[in-house]
């Protein structure tokens, strides 16, 4: 039940009304802050309390109609207000309160007062249950009011009930109960309004002394005080005021004058400057609600606790309102951040979000307990930071994608010279050449192709030998750039922002650091994957180039297949080449392999926190880093949960030292980056190169590469064993000791047989040589004896035997014929005579060629056959062709006559009409 000027806050049944907050807001009271006061009135029923308030504060509380008889009028507790607009309009300057005027002194400033009209005690309507409600209402009034008016009649001062002695005792007991623990509690104004007082009866000073001595002090002495207030005086808790009011009917004019004087005293003398209970106006409704509920539940009413509870409630409410007001802006920015990088995030967040939110929050929340206000402010900022974290994550993810791509491109570009060069190593005769020597002196070298190739070779070896160092330094640069971008997202906030008397420059500032670990972990994962990928590619390039070098060095093995005469010479040569290659690889490329090869077991590197230990992982290019006794795997397994890992890392004190080299990250995160990061990887590699276990592992690896290439070469030879045998046979059969072609016309049959036998034995000796039937310690482990498949050998032998026999038959034929059937023995004059005698035939064949298409294929086939025989020197076929030519020439004349007869037949004459 409320209207524009008043509202009921506690009904007759003792239930609090929920619309108090709305009523205060509608009447412009919720924005007063602490600039208001509360006054409550207690007294017997029908003692004129509401009448007094209506006259004193211009309120409109219901009053008793005496014509209808005495009855209960005010039920429960009602609340109204007075803004003292008449005082403001009148511009009274009689007040002495310094706060009653504004800073310019032109117009008085009077805080509004909330007036609490309490149901009268000693009520017949409530009967025996009245004491409960009276105690509750008194307790409620004292918890709220700056001033409590005790309304009593002059003629009842000597009575117990009518003089409100029992009520006064209840008031003082309750006040002591409420505030005895609060040393700095505000004093409550206890104002006794003596109604129907006449100066003729007794001076006001006498009445004041009587009330103080016989009522206040006596009751105070009778009270059972707690130990903390045993020696306390009544003046420590109350300000006693006694006011005499004339009879409202008999001396109405005097009564109104007394009311006016009391009103003026309240406005300019009695009222506290601000609400003494330190409850802001916007929290007054909730404070009333909390106080009454605590009283009804018969709980111990602790005013500081209630104030703390109200402060918590209101600060939370204000915080939520602020969050609601800015959530729309943040959501729009979050959506925008999904599509692009948010520029000037720091300025936008500090000015449009943080500063605006803090100011909006402190306007109302700063009126409540400072500790709770600041605590809730931290919660507000934390809630804002949680929302802003999404934008920061999107910005950092955008940054990490760019940096990840840049890292990959730069590392790839750094090694592009090695990727494009597909050649082989030029083996240096200097065994002590420094594999990591810089190519600064290459400009002084010969500019020939070989020198340029050596320059590229030296550059690639230098790059490969420093791969981990280059990747480590590039990682440092990348992470440093990421951290620089992250610092652009940090927000500067002002500590102690509630201290309004401090300038912003004098207030301490601190940065809020957003969580960047998720984005940094993704970037680190990408760096490790790209590094391992490029590392693997470069390792494969290095191995392929070594294989090409081995293949180049094994070229002489093909030449030896024709000339070698014993197995020992052949395999000693292969062993020599193997040792040469192994020595070159070990001397010049060992550091390259330690940098590039994944899976090499090391001591100094794997046990450190450098990049090598993180890169030396599985083929999925995940990365592993250790922290204390825990191991975290960041491979691409779907079961891995980065959030869970992040949580575990957060629980660790030095979590970032696990992700990166601790010194590196310490340098990166320093505000003043004067210290330069120096990678220790090359020093660790130098120590590692003296590790005997590593040296043995590397040498075994080199031997495996060389043997693999050698096996491929030997497999090629095995598959071509027939041609190898034939070439060896021809090198002895067709040429004599001084490498001159043999003249078979001058060789006897016996000599031919001996030559054939020797050549055949020499040719088939290669099979025994290739089977490695001798012991070679270094190669036996990898290349056993008789390693060539028997089937391959037999097939090769069979094919070679056929060809050898053909070669021998040709030699025998030449030996028998003496070479007479060869076209080389036909006189040149024969060809001239053949051309002259066969000229007409050539012309006839030419004419037939243009008439009969079948002649062309036959002619072309003939030309091809003859040309092939001439080219290959097939004497047998050429002899057949010679015989055919002689037969054609012998019978050419008869053939020519026949053609002339056919050609000279007269044509049939045409008929003439």
Swiss-Prot record:
General function of this protein: Probable GTP-binding protein involved in generating and maintaining the structure of the tubular endoplasmic reticulum network.
Record domain GB1/RHD3-type G: where: 33-288
Ribosomal protein as UniProt keyword: no
Record GO biological process: endoplasmic reticulum membrane fusion
Protein name: Protein SEY1 homolog
Lumenal side of membrane: 847-849
UniProt-listed InterPro entries: G_GB1_RHD3_dom, P-loop_NTPase, RHD3/Sey1
Residues holding GTP: 43-50
Cytoplasmic side: 1-825, 871-913
CDD domains: GBP
Family annotation (SUPFAM superfamilies): P-loop containing nucleoside triphosphate hydrolases
Organism of derivation: Plasmodium chabaudi chabaudi
A cellular-component GO term for this protein: endoplasmic reticulum membrane
Group of enzyme by EC: hydrolase
Molecular functions (GO terms): GTP binding; GTPase activity
Gene name of the encoded protein: SEY1
Annotated S-S bridges: none
């Amino acid at each position: 039940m409320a209207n524009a000027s008043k509202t009921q806050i506690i009904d007759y049944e003792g239930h609090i009304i929920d619309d108090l907050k709305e009523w205060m807001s509608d009447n412009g009271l919720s924005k007063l802050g602490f600039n208001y006061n509360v006054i409550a009135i207690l007294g017997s029923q029908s003692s004129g309390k509401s009448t007094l308030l209506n006259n004193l504060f211009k309120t409109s509380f219901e009053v008793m109609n005496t014509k209808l008889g005495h009855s209960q009028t005010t039920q429960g507790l009602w609340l109204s207000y007075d803004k003292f607009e008449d005082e403001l309009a009148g511009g009274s300057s009689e007040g002495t309160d310094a706060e009653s005027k504004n800073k310019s002194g032109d117009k008085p400033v009077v805080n509004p007062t909330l007036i609490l009209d309490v149901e009268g005690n000693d009520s017949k309507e409530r009967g025996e249950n009245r004491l409960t409600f009276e105690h509750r209402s008194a307790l409620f009034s004292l918890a709220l009011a700056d001033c409590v008016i005790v309304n009593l009649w002059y003629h009842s001062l000597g009575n117990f009930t009518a003089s409100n002695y029992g009520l006064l005792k209840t008031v003082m007991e309750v006040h002591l109960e409420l505030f005895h623990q609060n040393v700095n509690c505000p004093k409550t104004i206890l104002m006794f309004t003596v109604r129907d007082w006449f100066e003729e009866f007794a001076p006001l000073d006498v009445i004041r002394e009587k009330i103080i001595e016989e009522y206040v002090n006596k009751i105070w002495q009778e009270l059972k005080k707690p130990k903390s207030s045993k020696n306390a005086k009544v003046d420590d808790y109350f300000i006693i005021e006694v006011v005499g009011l004339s009879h409202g009917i008999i001396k109405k004019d005097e009564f109104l004058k007394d009311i006016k004087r009391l009103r003026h005293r309240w406005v300019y003398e009695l009222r506290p400057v601000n609400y003494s209970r330190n409850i802001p106006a916007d929290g007054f409704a909730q404070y009333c609600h909390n106080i009454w509920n605590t009283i009804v539940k018969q709980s111990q009413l602790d005013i500081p606790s209630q104030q703390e509870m109200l402060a918590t409630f209101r600060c939370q409410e204000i915080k939520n309102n602020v969050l609601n007001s800015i959530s729309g802006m943040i959501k729009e920015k979050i959506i925008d951040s999904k599509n692009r990088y948010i520029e000037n995030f720091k300025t936008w967040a500090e000015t449009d979000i943080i500063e605006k939110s803090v100011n909006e929050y402190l306007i109302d929340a700063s009126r409540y307990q400072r500790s709770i206000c600041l605590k809730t402010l931290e919660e507000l900022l934390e809630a804002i930071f949680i929302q802003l974290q999404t934008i920061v994550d999107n910005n950092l993810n955008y940054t990490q994608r760019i940096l990840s791509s840049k890292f990959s491109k730069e590392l790839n570009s750094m090694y592009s010279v090695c990727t494009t060069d597909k050649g082989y190593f030029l083996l240096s005769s200097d065994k002590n050449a420094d594999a990591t020597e810089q190519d600064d002196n290459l400009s002084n070298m010969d500019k020939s192709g070989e020198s340029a190739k050596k320059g590229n070779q030296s550059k690639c070896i230098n790059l490969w030998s420093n791969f981990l160092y280059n990747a480590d330094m590039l990682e440092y640069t990348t992470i440093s750039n990421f951290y620089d971008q992250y610092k652009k997202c940090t927000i500067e906030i002002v500590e102690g922002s509630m201290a309004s008397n401090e300038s912003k420059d004098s207030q301490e500032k601190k940065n809020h650091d957003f969580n960047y670990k998720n984005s940094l972990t993704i970037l680190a994962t990408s760096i490790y994957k790209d590094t391992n990928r490029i590392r693997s590619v470069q390792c494969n390039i290095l191995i392929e180039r070594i294989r090409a070098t081995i293949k180049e060095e094994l070229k002489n093995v093909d030449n030896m297949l024709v000339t070698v005469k014993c197995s020992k010479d052949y395999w000693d040569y292969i062993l020599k080449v193997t040792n040469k290659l192994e020595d070159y690889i070990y001397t010049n490329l060992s550091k390259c392999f330690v940098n590039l090869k994944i899976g090499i077991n090391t001591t100094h590197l794997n046990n450190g926190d450098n990049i090598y230990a993180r890169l030396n992982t599985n083929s999925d290019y995940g990365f592993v880093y250790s922290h204390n006794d825990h191991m975290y795997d960041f491979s691409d397994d779907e079961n891995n949960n980065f959030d869970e890992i992040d949580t575990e890392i957060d629980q660790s004190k030095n979590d970032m030292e696990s992700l990166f080299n601790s010194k590196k990250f310490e340098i990166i995160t320093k505000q003043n980056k004067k210290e330069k990061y120096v990678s220790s990887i090359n020093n660790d590699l130098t120590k590692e190169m003296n590790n005997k276990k590593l040296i043995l592992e590397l040498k075994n690896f080199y031997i495996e590469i060389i043997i693999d290439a050698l096996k491929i070469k030997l497999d090629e030879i095995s598959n071509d064993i027939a041609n190898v045998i034939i070439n060896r046979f021809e090198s002895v059969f067709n040429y004599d000791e001084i490498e001159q072609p043999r003249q078979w016309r001058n060789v006897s049959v016996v000599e031919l047989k001996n030559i054939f036998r020797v050549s055949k034995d020499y040719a088939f000796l290669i099979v025994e040589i290739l089977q490695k039937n001798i012991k070679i310690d270094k190669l036996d482990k990898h290349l056993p004896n008789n390693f060539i498949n028997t089937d391959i050998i037999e097939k090769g032998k069979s094919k070679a035997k056929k060809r050898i026999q053909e070669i021998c038959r040709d030699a025998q034929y030449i030996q028998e014929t003496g070479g007479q059937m060869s076209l080389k023995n036909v006189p040149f004059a024969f060809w001239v005579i053949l051309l002259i005698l066969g000229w007409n035939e050539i012309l006839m064949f030419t004419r037939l060629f243009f008439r009969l298409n079948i002649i062309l294929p036959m002619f072309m086939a003939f030309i091809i056959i003859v040309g092939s025989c001439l080219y290959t020197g097939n004497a047998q076929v050429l002899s057949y062709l010679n015989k055919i030519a002689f037969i054609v020439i012998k019978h050419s004349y008869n053939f020519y006559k026949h053609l002339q007869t056919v050609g000279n037949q007269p044509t049939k004459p045409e008929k003439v009409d």
